[in-house]
Amino acid sequence: MSTQPIIYVLSDSVGETAELVVKAGLSQFKNGDYKIQRVPYVEDKETVDEFLALAKDTVSIVGFTLVDPELRAYVNSQAKKLEVEAIDIMGPTMDAMGRVFNRTPRLEAGLVHKLDEDYFKKIEAIEFAVKYDDGRDPRGIARADIILIGVSRTSKTPLSQYLAHKRIKVANVPIVPEVDPPEELMMVDPKKCIGLKITAEKLNSIRKERLKALGLGDQATYANMNRIEQELEYFQSIVDKIGCQVIDVSNKAVEETANHILRLKQENNSL
């Protein structure tokens, strides 16, 4: 019989959660020569039998995270029969939650890792929105899930960030009469592009407030009505050329516009 203690970690997923718990426990024991053997994707009694038999012949503990109640019960009963120390790492927690919440658990393996995947997708989308904000790099247009286009102060950046938190990669492109829009904008699927329209009066008010916030006079060309109308006419010519959908953001909060965009995306994906 081996004298080095072994902790077998059985899991119906990758086993990372169980291993972390075991390591946390081991950290309380100084100078221990312990071995952890992770056994992922356990789905049948044969695998359970194999490692319980190994544990019986060594100085071992079997720790397990299994969501299937039948398999959990089997491990516990067989371990007791073979006099193997077995620890149900997640079962008692799920059972207690079910009792207190009066709800039935989903009993799906690997959900923690699905949540982790969602988290990293969100971070990736946020980084994407920053990198391809305000037309900084037109290469992002082809890679984006959604491309927002509009004149200055139509909430392109806050919308990009809001949608990024929904794990959607957004590039945004400013429309300025003196600058031709990037060629990439004319090459993507028009369904991915969304124009942000605003009334001249509303834009004039927003830009004046912006100039005041910067400590500048509100008579600058940036807030001039003739200039604004010129920009909006140019914007309209661009969205007409692309053939994309347009949302009027004049009196909409960012959240309201974002939800409208999400609905459009869902409709387009279902076509």
Swiss-Prot record:
Pfam short name (any one): Kinase-PPPase
GO molecular function ontology, one term from the record: protein serine/threonine kinase activity
Keyword Chaperone: no
Residues annotated to bind ADP: G150, V151, S152, R153, T154, S155, K156, T157
Swiss-Prot/TrEMBL catalytic activity: N(tele)-phospho-L-histidyl/L-threonyl-[pyruvate, phosphate dikinase] + ADP = N(tele)-phospho-L-histidyl/O-phospho-L-threonyl-[pyruvate, phosphate dikinase] + AMP + H(+); N(tele)-phospho-L-histidyl/O-phospho-L-threonyl-[pyruvate, phosphate dikinase] + phosphate + H(+) = N(tele)-phospho-L-histidyl/L-threonyl-[pyruvate, phosphate dikinase] + diphosphate
Classification via InterPro entries: Kinase-pyrophosphorylase, PPDK_reg
Entry's transmembrane regions: none
Domain of life: Bacteria
Enzyme Commission identifier(s): 2.7.11.32, 2.7.4.27
EC category: transferase
Keywords, ordered alphabetically: Kinase, Nucleotide-binding, Serine/threonine-protein kinase, Transferase
Physiological role: Bifunctional serine/threonine kinase and phosphorylase involved in the regulation of the pyruvate, phosphate dikinase (PPDK) by catalyzing its phosphorylation/dephosphorylation.
Annotated PANTHER family: PYRUVATE, PHOSPHATE DIKINASE REGULATORY PROTEIN 1, CHLOROPLASTIC
Family according to the record: Belongs to the pyruvate, phosphate/water dikinase regulatory protein family. PDRP subfamily.
Name of this protein: Putative pyruvate, phosphate dikinase regulatory protein
